[in-house]
Swiss-Prot record:
The protein, known as: Minor capsid protein VP2
Record note on domains: The N-terminus domain points away from the virion surface.
Stretches with biased composition (Pro residues): 149-166
Region (Disordered): 138-166
Keyword Cell inner membrane attached: no
A cellular-component GO term for this protein: viral capsid, decoration
Length: 166
């Protein structure tokens, strides 16, 4: 029976040794998996940091150049530079007479012409009220010239028609 006991003990030792070896292999596999997970996590952290830096760069760029880029894209979309600035938050106005012109694309604006009739009428009324800033200057003091008459100008229409006493 001693050989059976020795064989059983040897088999038990072999099973224990196989269990220890499989445990060591499993632990090594677990270590490899943890190292892979750590590598993936480190890569994820690097990418997140790069995304945050890129986001900060974009925020800074938009804070500095955002309005200019918006205006440029609106001009490229077909708006006039003034209308693009108005759409981007500018306070400029475009008046046709006493009315503010709405924001329109260039294609629509090509059919609208600005006549400036109201400005011409306002200029004429101002000239009647205040006088014109052009023309002959007032006569210098002590200078006598028939072209410098203090009387208002006269309109000569031609010879007088004959008069009759009927």
């Amino acid at each position: 029976m001693s050989w059976f006991t020795g064989a059983s003990l040897a088999a038990g030792s072999l099973v224990d040794m196989a269990g220890t070896i499989s445990s060591i292999v499993a632990q090594q596999r677990q270590i490899d998996l943890m190292a892979e997970a750590n590598r993936i996590q480190a890569d994820w952290v690097r990418r997140q940091e790069a995304l945050q830096i890129r986001g900060q760069d974009i925020s800074r760029d938009l804070a500095v150049n955002g309005t200019a880029q918006r205006v440029e894209s609106l001009v490229n979309a077909g708006f006039t530079p003034v209308d693009a600035r108005r759409l981007a938050g500018g306070t400029e106005t475009v008046s046709y007479g006493l009315l503010d012109r709405p924001i329109l694309q260039r294609g629509i604006l090509s059919g609208i012409t600005e006549t400036r009739h109201l400005q011409a009428m306002q200029g004429a009324l101002s000239a009647f009220k205040n006088g014109a800033s052009y023309g002959a200057p007032p006569a210098p003091s002590g200078f006598v010239n028939p072209n410098y008459q203090p009387s208002p100008p006269r309109l000569k229409l031609g010879p007088r028609p004959p008069s009759t006493n009927v």
